[in-house]
């Protein structure tokens, strides 16, 4: 039986000079080998404990392995409207719960999903789903990111007339402006949006709700309002020197390059070309910044993280089938990004012109629980040093929804963590990150489906 394939990327020397998808396409035989590995579990945990969408992974793998690709696509499409997105940008929670991963390596479920959906598109099986009849109700969806698009698709299939509003020039939200092309080429997004438009979903872009159009206007003219606006408020680093030039939020940096790639700008507003780049924050957004900076021609790229270095294998603190805490190395890290853990930032250092020139940091030592979970850090004496940098990117996550726009106009209450509290009694709903806090694309989609189901039940009862 074939094992998991680890080398799935295009050559580093090739991919670091373009924004094309970093992953090389696996041929049908290689994917089939992975699908056949899926048949060795007794009770599958991948689609229950793992996938938030409850994709029927063993079923679509079994169908495709037997050559029934159309049936595999039909099984996948019953639970996932946009597998071409999740098969590229999801961390594959399903693989963390794969039975093959208990004593070995998980099946490459994400690659199997990608092969199925791309085969479906190439074969002409992905067709617009136009509901047989409309129910006479109109829904306004504010935000066209993962949760907004997923909810719009679900509501449209239920017979609602759906209009999706987007503040940016083009629809897609985070998928278009926040995720680099080397992970998700925008032609894939445009391909799906074209299908959705043929289904009758209306997209109104370049429209800021709460400024260009009031949220109350939407409530007067639609039967319900669904906010799917994400959590764009980035977590800041309030240390001395924060006012220096050359310190930017990660999303600002990523959006600029994506707008260049999409033809909206001639040059990125924030460029890493020729600079020593320091990324503060060790998550996926920081990794995306690293890959983008490398492609822009940065002199050096370093990513620092206050958390400890994860173990090479699953930590006992996250036993199977939980999502494992363990070291993960992205395609961007392999392209020339240095990584450091246990690093806390103290002060930004500036030059005579008022630009950032470095960051004073110190190391921390973590206290761990008996099963290896990091509990709290303490400064390491004598570890102070300065990391040179003339471009600093803050990638430390997001704090919630800003006190502006539709949420402010509607005077919605918030949780202690800044998430919006929907008010169905006022016909106001919220889905995805704005209602739950920043999380994964696939979790935002799963929540959008749950909210759309609730809206359907309440509005048609």
Range-by-range predicted roles:
Residues 1-34, 84, 104-137, 242-256, ...:
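Extreme N-terminal leader/targeting segments of oxidoreductases
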Residues 2-24, 36, 54-66, 71-77, ...:
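Beta1-alpha1 glycine-rich phosphate/pyrophosphate-binding loop at the start
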Residues 36-39, 277-279, 421-445, 449-450:
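Short FAD-binding loop at a beta-strand-to-alpha-helix junction that anchors the flavin cofactor
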Residues 116-132, 191-211, 234-296, 410, ...:
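Glycine-rich dinucleotide-binding loop and its adjacent helix/turn
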Residues 187-235, 258-267, 294-414:
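A Rossmann-like FAD-binding core segment of flavoenzymes
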Residues 228-229, 250, 280, 389, ...:
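Short, well-ordered coil/turn residues at beta-beta hairpins
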Residues 286-291, 296, 434-461:
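A conserved FAD-binding loop/helix module that cradles the flavin
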